[in-house]
Amino acid sequence: NPDMVFEYASTSKITLPGAGISVMATSTANLAYMEKLMDIQMISYDKVNQLRHVLFLQDKAHTLALMQQHAAILRPKFRCVLRCLEREIAPLGIAAWQKPTGGYFVSVNTLPGLAKRTLALCKEAGVTMTGAGATFPYGIDPNDSNIRIAPSLPPVSELEQAIAIFCNSLKLAALEKLGV
């Protein structure tokens, strides 16, 4: 059934965080329905921002080259995070994660009931991170286990300190949960 699919994409992390442009792919029937909804919700699209993106991204080749530049900047940051998780957390079995092959986040799934406490301990130590359960609707993670790490902003030197604090906070939260 072609009317079951709505596929979305955005340039938000590629160009201007929070000010990217988005696209939607769907069936003709779904598109007609969405156009009716959107017609009521907005007077006009931000055409200046759309033009800004067209001029900046230019074409597929230029966009792919830009993404390679992003990868070169982000790769050492992701390596830093993954290296610390593998060294400090993997042997303990208190969390799991996937090694991303793209994107801007590492999603860490702790043992149930550890995410909020882990981030509270991080905050006490001076490290602010995205809220626990941010990947869930309304930020409500029924298992209190999901933490999204976004390593793109800090330089690697600061990231090394922050991820060490994160790992130690997760260990402490696990010990508290176990009553040790």
Residues of each region from the PLM?
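Inter-domain helical "communication" segments and dimerization helices
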Residues: L55-L66, E86-R87, P91, R117, ...
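Short beta-strand segments
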Residues: A9, V23-A25, K99, F105-N109, ...
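PLP-dependent enzyme catalytic core of the Aspartate aminotransferase-like
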Residues: I140-V180
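Short, conserved active-site loop motifs that form the nucleotide-linked donor/cofactor pocket
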Residues: V5, A95, V127
